[in-house]
């Protein structure tokens, strides 16, 4: 649906109309809609994973460029009710380098690899805040949509 539309704002507006949701009017409305949708989808996926595995997670690790968006990271923490650990930003390149280092014997194992990452790169933690009534309503509406 939103994978690669020709015109993303139009696709969002049409979906909002079709699902009887408020249609974004400004650039800020669209940005907020997208970020809230991402956070809600993270919550939905985490609920599914926890339901399938029976394992409860108290922390979500997010890597890559999206971690630079503090609003998205805090929103994710709030919506999921879980601590978000954000970073490192350049996770793909770092991972490739460290796997090569492991192959060359410079990194002993995955435990050592994770230790190198923790000591070498900045990460930021976001603690969940109580979800507002509007946030709870957004989760309810999100669940009502056809996933």
What are the roles of these predicted feature ranges?
Residues 1-147:
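Glycine/Thr-rich phosphate-binding loops that ligate phosphate moieties of nucleotide
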């Amino acid at each position: 649906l939103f994978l690669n539309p020709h015109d993303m704002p139009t696709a969002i507006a049409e979906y909002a109309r079709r699902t009887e949701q408020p249609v974004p009017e400004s650039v800020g409305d669209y940005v907020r809609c997208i970020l809230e949708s991402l956070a809600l989808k993270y919550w939905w996926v985490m609920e599914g994973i926890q339901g399938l595995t029976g394992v409860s997670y108290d922390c979500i690790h997010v890597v890559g460029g999206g971690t630079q968006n503090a609003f998205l990271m805090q929103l994710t923490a709030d919506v999921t009710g879980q601590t978000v650990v954000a970073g490192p930003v350049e996770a793909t390149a770092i991972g490739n380098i460290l796997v090569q280092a492991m192959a060359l014997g410079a990194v002993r194992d995955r435990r050592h690899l994770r230790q190198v990452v923790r000591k070498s790169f900045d990460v930021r933690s976001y603690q969940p805040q109580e979800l507002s009534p509007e946030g709870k309503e957004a989760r309810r509406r999100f669940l009502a949509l056809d996933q």
